[in-house]
Amino acid sequence: PDHVSCVYIRQGEPLGLGHAILQAKTVIGDDSFAVVLADDLIDSKKGVLKQMAEQYVDINSSIVSVQKIEKKDSIHYGMIDTDPSDGNMRKLTGIVEKPSPADSPSNFGVVGRYIFSNQILSFLETIGFGAGNEIQLTDAIKKMIATQPVFAYEFEGARYDCGDKLGYIKANIEYALKDKKFGRELLSYLKEKAL
């Protein structure tokens, strides 16, 4: 859209997601901002970022997107703890980076979409290096939770982990099946291979 401008900033060295966000500090300034991790592809009627932005307007607090995952997979995610709620929006009470299944506070994992107030930057600047000798976004979120509300949003849509080879293949198949030109032919091929 005409009213949107994109700026790309390279992270000079792989020092974690928190470090990557800090590279954009001068561009972010005093604004709220979104973080989108490209390896999390989410297929939904209404874009997840749009869903989250609508929530942000209502609550004016930082939001992380979450999805129910199998506890055995908690070692791959930031796992959250929240106030009890029946809705898709929950107030965070804790977050742990890649815990063992036994130590996971819930079955909700954080997945690749965030909207933050610029205050997250001050937490990122002061937390130092965490797990993997990286600046961990989850550590900054944990500090933020102690001073202001942060919410978890269980989005509507199907997520594909394109950082995983099988997840990448599944995403390509799902999107190809929806394609008007190739979908039917691909479905016939897959059925033939399944027999």
What would you call each of these model-derived segments?
Residues 1-79, 125-127:
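Conserved beta-loop-beta/alpha segment of the NTase-like Rossmann-fold superfamily
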Residues 11, 67, 82, 97-98, ...:
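Active-site donor-binding loop signature of nucleotide-sugar glycosyltransferases
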Residues 34, 54-57, 86-188:
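Catalytic-core segments of class I nucleotidyltransferases/pyrophosphorylases
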Residues 190-192:
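N-terminus-biased detector of the onset of the functional/mature region
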Residues 22-26, 77-82, 110-111, 166-170:
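Short, surface-exposed amphipathic charged segments that create phosphate/polyanion-binding patches used
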